[in-house]
């Protein structure tokens, strides 16, 4: 029984991982070497060194080694058995059947080696897959390196079983799936996994009856094929007659691996001229007809290609599913190492963590590099060397591989020949070579055997052709060939020019720096790597070769500034002089027909989409050599600060690994010009914060401003932050808001702030949850250190509408209103929050703003309604009711309701005297007018001390559910879900528009959310933190559906990020989705629109006029009643402003024409010092109107924001009139 169970486990694991022969092209060589090892102790020693080198620690979670070996043996026997299956020649074969074509095909072309060839990467469980958006067809299939406008959305992560899932917009299953990605990232591996999983009955069996796998590099060897012959090639053994297979074309899947490799043009033939399936035609025409749907239009296709090759490959690909392979996750990198080195049957070693070489681990995101690294380590072990790898680039790793595998310098001549073969193949887009090709090139028989043995070359199973172990390896050898050619004196400058021309002709000007050959070439021109090449080839390279080639490539006029591909090339080169010269000579504002200048808040702010850890590493590495002063890594729900130009914003849709954080922060140790870093919205682990603070302590780090808003920091992280502040860091501004630091964490920060070496001048953190003792400690620190300004999101200066003595509406700070009300714990809310009853409005008071707790005193029996919250109370007598705003997330996530019910309205915590309330109407946002929702599905959830209770309301009205004789606890409306309906529930929604003026630019935030007062309040508070003001515009008239997507557009040319909004419910405590709209000049106004993405019908529009916009000014503090007159903010702080305004001329420029005449402007400017200029300005201000002083205040706020914020915090409010 044990043996049976073992076999069963083996079969299961093999289905997931594949065989060792699939893993490695040098499998047989490895087995021979294993037999040559002297003892198991050698292996044990090696594994111990490996564990030490890579920083792994042991766990008990991985599969035992013995089991893995059994799986490998089983899979090897299974493939051996399959390969021996032959057709019975005595079987009767009719014309056009699969067996006949199968046998005929064997005589003309080698069998497709999709399942038997010794590939590199079949021993991993899964790859990171990003399903991308493809709006409007396939006009732009290639992801641009620079995005003047960031894509509407970055897509979402999927699994292999989701490749053919229905399109979210059309609900149609795709017929074409494009697997794209960088070189060596695992595209072919994924395609083979699909075929293998289907063969073994694990994937897509319900959708496809036949799956055919084709290697396009092998198909390209054929001149002509019929459709029947093509189908025969796609099967390991014949399964059914051709006619029977073609009778259900909708059940067929054709997998075309490496569609971009051959040098062909796939042309669709005229549908009227389509030939019979048994008639041969040129291969490229046959494939072009498949792609163009001229033949088998109902069939499905899966293509794999490098991303850069897609656009010119096929003119039109309809509406494909585009899936980008992003390589290994950090866990899968570790898993790959485990499987690669799991060889000794009696040794069980579980590797859990890779941490000591973050750059190498980031490089290993690419599966091919993983294999390369493992091979190098294994070669070192075989040669008895101490395990050590210091390679920082893929190029250096390839050279290390060569130095470890090439047996001595006597092969240097043959190695040159192999390089020439590789270069010729790259130019001709050939990856398969016949024996005669190798001999014609000058490769000797013994050299070919050696290259096969060491794994540089591999023989195809048919023995008819050879190839490099991987296309990337061929490209590396081609790059070496160009170095060898250009080093010959006979070529001189002409050789350099010819090399560049050859590369441009092969890859195109736009994609030159995306080509691995070019990246390897730049890497080989590194001083250290050229010395390594000299050792390998036993020759000397003139240094002029290096300089001239670099100049030829980087100095070309088509070299695009700040191109992601160029960043990769510069990273491979690693030469500081080249990096500095290149990065500093390119402006950040791109120009030209393909590069529109991108303006965020200003010019010189560029956006770049990065998808992988590798891309993040190379970009941040190059940035440290540039003139970029501000860097933002865009996080989810992140509010943006104004960045100092030149700046760069990086967008990423996938999680960042721990190794990648370490590399990023390591690059900050010497930042040159980088002074601002915004990581807000990105979750930072304990170890990531430690790496960050270590970098900030380095003398070469010049960062002055660090934003860590909403990064998931805890008190545990504060010890590192405090240590960094105490270590002579240059950091002057630190924002830690929306992090749960707690009293203990803030106390640790205070220790760092007290250190005389601390240079911090601005600290922003939340104080609402802090104890009075800690807040007092912070204030004492400010008093002791006048240069330190501690800002808070504590709303002590929140303002509310009141009536001034003239009967006009003014604004009063909540702090002063508390004093005027006679209750220091209460604040009156505005009239929108009043309860309207029999005697008119009843004001609502704030009990605790931070806890969202309010109170209303209803004076008599009757019905009361609050328009703002939607709450109704029917009371029998005077009663005081307390109302708290809650978040569903804190109650629902531990109950089964989250799977069976959807939130249908806000959640309130209501407290009232028992028996005083006879009915309560709880608001909901489900639209009943559509007639699609049964009112019996509504429930009111009570969250009580003893558990949760669902209660059926007495009745359900269009906007609320009525609960009679209620008992109170946290309560709200839920809707029971019906599986057939899913989430397609019509709801009432609202649009919220906020704006902020900065200089001449206007930034709008547009939200589309359910009509939930708690969400609206949370958004209001969040926007207020960043001084955005809400504009009231009508909501959508019709009901909308949760999960639907809407396109945001404008009547003018504006920048909208993202261009789509999804209507979804998010808890008030979560970040809400919004579109950010940048407007340089609003002119007479702009028209904003929301259009249903699926049906393209207009669902909402609003006209924003200049009159809708008012400066985003803080609120005004009321003067005491006995005050003779209300002083404006600028008059209240005249002394401070005269003493502390350090730059008057920009202030005067803003007032010129609005407040100051030409004569006044020149008179003030003529004063000798800033203080004299300010005194002269204030003397003239005595005759200014209140509006003129408002302009003065706004100009001060724009030119001296920190000063104004400091004065606001200390005064508790601002006296301005809107």
Swiss-Prot record:
Q: Where is this region: ZU5?
A: 835-968
Tell where it localizes. Cytoplasm, Cytosol; Cytoplasm; Nucleus
Which residue stretches does the UniProt record annotate as biased composition, category Polar residues?
A: 1-29, 799-815
Q: Main localization of the protein? A: cytoplasm
Keyword Repeat found: yes
Domain FIIND: start-end pairs: 835-1118
What's the EC number here? 3.4.-.-
Domain CARD per the UniProt entry, residue ranges: 1122-1211
Cite the position(s) of the site with description Cleavage: 968-969
Biased segments, Basic residues type: 77-87
Residue stretches making up the NACHT domain: 175-484
Q: Where is this region: UPA?
A: 969-1118
Q: What is this protein called?
A: NACHT, LRR and PYD domains-containing protein 1a allele 3
The entry summarizes how activity is regulated as: Activated by pathogens and other damage-associated signals: activation promotes ubiquitination and degradation of the N-terminal part, releasing the cleaved C-terminal part of the protein (NACHT, LRR and PYD domains-containing protein 1a, C-terminus), which polymerizes and forms the Nlrp1a inflammasome. Nlrp1a inflammasome is inhibited by DPP8 and DPP9, which sequester the C-terminal fragment of Nlrp1a (NACHT, LRR and PYD domains-containing protein 1a, C-terminus) in a ternary complex, thereby preventing Nlrp1a oligomerization and activation.
Q: How does it assemble?
A: Interacts (via LRR repeats) with BCL2 and BCL2L1 (via the loop between motifs BH4 and BH3). Interacts with NOD2; this interaction is enhanced in the presence of muramyl dipeptide (MDP) and increases IL1B release. Interacts with EIF2AK2/PKR; this interaction requires EIF2AK2 activity, is accompanied by EIF2AK2 autophosphorylation and promotes inflammasome assembly in response to danger-associated signals. Interacts with MEFV; this interaction targets Nlrp1a to degradation by autophagy, hence preventing excessive IL1B- and IL18-mediated inflammation.
MF terms from GO for this chain are: ATP binding; ATP hydrolysis activity; cysteine-type endopeptidase activator activity; double-stranded DNA binding; double-stranded RNA binding; enzyme binding; molecular condensate scaffold activity; pattern recognition receptor activity
